[in-house]
Amino acid sequence: MMMSFFAAISILAFVPSICAAGDDEVKTEKKMAGDDFNIVRDEVIDGIRYITAAPSSLVCSVRIDIHLKGDVVDSVVYTRGCNGNAKGIGALIRGMKVDEAISRLKGIDCAGRGTSCPDQLARVLEAAMKREPAVK
């Protein structure tokens, strides 16, 4: 009878570690594909906000340069990626309010990757709007 009691205690002691491991896995899975972008520059010079970001490794572009005048997109330039599409995105959102650009671009998927170059732009803009840029 004592062996059964100790065996039960051992099993119960092991269960929380299994559950804890499962919780970590769930947290990891909730991280969205494409969240590995990095804002490398975010500063205001003479009233223009300059944002440079390294997008997710899941997309073809390797850099996004954004200029904002207040809450309006002044220009967007992608480095690498689909040249015509990248130029098209920049031309289409020039003059658009940042919130509108985010709303239109966020969630666009490319080839089942869970993100895209337009989605990365939306994510970068969204993250940038939540922080204060350096002022020079």
Predicted features by range, described:
Residues 12, 29-33, 130:
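Short amphipathic alpha-helical "recognition" segments used for binding
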Residues 48-50, 54-135:
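Active-site- and interface-proximal helix/loop "cap" or "latch" segments in soluble metabolic
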Residues 4-14:
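Bacterial N-terminal signal peptides
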Residues 28-56, 66-67:
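N-terminal secretory signal peptides
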Residues 18-31:
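Cleaved targeting-peptide boundary
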